[in-house]
Amino acid sequence: MRYLTAGESHGPSLTAIIEGIPAGLKLSAKDINEDLKRRQGGYGRGNRMKIETDQVIISSGVRHGKTLGSPITLTVTNKDHSKWLDIMSVEDIEERLKQKRRIKHPRPGHADLVGGIKYRFDDLRNALERSSARETTMRVAIGAIAKRILKEIGIEIANHIVVFGGKEITVPDKLTVQQIKVLSSQSQVAIVNPSFEQEIKDYIDSVKKAGDTIGGVVETIVGGVPVGLGSYVHWDRKLDAKIAQAVVSINAFKGVEFGLGFKSGFLKGSQVMDSISWTKDQGYIRQSNNLGGFEGGMTNGEPIIVRGVMKPIPTLYKPLMSVDIDTHEPYRATVERSDPTALPAAGVVMEAVVATVLVTEVLEKFSSDNMYELKEAVKLYRNYVDHF
């Protein structure tokens, strides 16, 4: 499976082309729109989420509610584009119109300045438009398709926030993936402990009032994963490494860990490794899951537990100092539309990119032209593992 996305934040639309989805997968626009709606939710989101009620158009690769095995084309229209017709015009326009929304005061923490230098732009909007988190709309759409495949082969995925603006959320022990999914969906701040809900909302309100932003840590959990996805044979075939790349590719994500993650550096080996046992009913199991479902770059049958840390959104309503790229004089950074936090939305994006990596790996191991053959191959393999 591979894909490309295209489109600018305030352009006419966002597009994705996906190749490698097996034929026979039940799929409708509704399946994708549900996740697009989740991405636009969450406490603290700004006015654009009220403007853009994202709806996908599937224009190829699906017929009568099932995939055809051919490339799938997805499009989401940017409703806000009608206010940007001159600024985002494909054709050349008058110089005075170009200057109306020209960006020359780069925002610290964004791609503005470095993108302008790299691509020789005198209007930093050219970098802003593509580097915007608006692009993640399409990655969520792609992830929605990936999750449909995972569900068909018995793999489920969920996300929740474990640190919100420096406030650590106490998570109840031994929650299932389904329980996490339900509890997180019932929370406006995507947490599984309701006792923290109001405290987090009040904190977001205070941060917004101060013109500032906050980040946090998102945890994604995947259950039902077969043993042996990924490989130790080469560095670039390790599945945890592929997931790590996908997670830190999300806008504003600056770190990733699995299981105990960085806490492992403070413990002894006997406190970290997961003891192995075997039962007739369950086969090989681990007595703990400190390694987050991975050993040697391969899935070991335990739930995948991966966390990503998101920095605070760089666009501040009380902007930091920057420089005018024309005069090189000190200047306050440009202010674009922003939110005090986008953590709940980031969790939806993280869930999507992890699902996409997993489906790509599944299709590599169980290469199949159609869903029937894929499900049979996975079933046969699971049976083999059970009797090893």
Swiss-Prot record:
Lyase keyword on record: yes
CDD domains according to UniProt: Chorismate_synthase
Binding positions (FMN): 130-132, 251-252, 296, 311-315, 337
Pathway annotation from the record: Metabolic intermediate biosynthesis; chorismate biosynthesis; chorismate from D-erythrose 4-phosphate and phosphoenolpyruvate: step 7/7
A Pfam family recorded for this sequence: Chorismate_synt
Molecular function as annotated in GO: chorismate synthase activity; FMN binding
Organism: Streptococcus agalactiae serotype V (strain ATCC BAA-611 / 2603 V/R)
GO annotation (BP), single: amino acid biosynthetic process
Swiss-Prot/TrEMBL keywords: Amino-acid biosynthesis, Aromatic amino acid biosynthesis, FAD, Flavoprotein, FMN, Lyase, NADP
Matching NCBIfam families: aroC, PRK05382.1
Record-listed NADP(+) binding positions: 39, 45
Role according to the record: This reaction introduces a second double bond into the aromatic ring system.
Family designation: Belongs to the chorismate synthase family.
Quaternary structure (record): Homotetramer.
Secretion signal span: none
Protein name as catalogued: Chorismate synthase
UniProt enzyme class: lyase
Cofactor binding remark: Reduced FMN (FMNH(2)).
InterPro entries for this protein: Chorismate_synth, Chorismate_synth_AroC_sf, Chorismate_synthase_CS
Catalytic activity: 5-O-(1-carboxyvinyl)-3-phosphoshikimate = chorismate + phosphate
Keyword match Nucleus: no
EC number: 4.2.3.5
GO CC term (a single one): cytosol
Cofactors required: FMNH2
